[in-house]
């Protein structure tokens, strides 16, 4: 999850975690420390620990769903080789524009360098399948999600009117996400 997120009731991530657990899936949905003033090393450490625990569940598909600043956290994890085993699928939802995160008060660390030539190879090393999705009206992506296409060498999906996929943007249940978990078809993510 992202900056200032405390896993609120009604948020699509929390609702999806509950739905998937009810269906019998193993779900990790940790609260990252200090969401108002995230410290990159602490977020990376928790991401590493949670990923390693996922590796302890044999025979299960390993899927990461990251939102907002959580997408930046996952990409830094991939760049830093903090994972033990690759993810079968990674979904980056509403990745923020690094220019915006660098200007936001309370977000520590260097902004993601989208020109880093290692970004795409490292992301592909740790994600067997990588999907990026964003809204066409995301306040955290004033230049549009297209800035991630050359950086990650993947064409992002655009969901019209999705905003930042937040409660403020009217995001609650996301049936398409549950469908994608089951099918693996990125097109399912466009279902609201």
Regions found by a protein language model. Name each.
Residues 126-127, 131-134:
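Short beta-strand/loop motif that positions the catalytic acidic residue
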Residues 24-28, 150-166:
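Catalytic histidine neighborhood in serine/cysteine hydrolases
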Residues 168-183:
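Post-His helix in hydrolase/transferase enzymes
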Residues 76-89, 98:
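Conserved hydrolase catalytic core segment
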Residues 1-60, 164:
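Active-site catalytic motif of lipid deacylating hydrolases and related acyltransferases
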Residues 139-144:
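Conserved alpha/beta-hydrolase "acid-adjacent" motif
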Residues 2, 32-35, 90-100:
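Active-site nucleophile loop of the alpha/beta-hydrolase fold
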Residues 65-75:
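Gly/Ala-rich beta-loop-alpha elbow adjacent to hydrolase catalytic centers
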């Amino acid at each position: 999850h992202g900056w200032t997120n405390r896993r609120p009731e009604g948020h699509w991530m929390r609702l999806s975690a509950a739905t998937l657990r009810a269906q019998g899936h193993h779900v990790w949905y940790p609260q990252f420390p200090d969401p108002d003033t995230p410290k990159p090393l602490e977020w990376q450490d928790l991401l590493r620990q949670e990923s390693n625990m996922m590796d302890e569940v044999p025979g299960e598909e390993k899927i990461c769903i990251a939102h907002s600043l959580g997408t930046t956290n996952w990409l830094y994890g991939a760049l830093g080789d903090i994972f033990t085993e690759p993810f079968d699928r990674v979904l980056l939802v509403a990745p923020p524009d690094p220019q915006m995160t660098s200007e936001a008060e309370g977000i520590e660390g260097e902004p993601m360098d989208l020109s880093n030539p290692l970004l795409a190879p490292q992301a592909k090393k740790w994600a067997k399948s990588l999907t990026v999705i964003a809204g066409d009206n995301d306040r955290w992506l004033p230049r549009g999600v297209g800035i991630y296409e050359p950086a990650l060498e993947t064409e992002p999906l655009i969901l019209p009117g999705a905003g930042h996929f937040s409660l403020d943007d009217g995001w609650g249940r996301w049936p398409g996400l549950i469908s994608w978990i089951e099918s693996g078809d990125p097109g399912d993510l466009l279902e609201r």
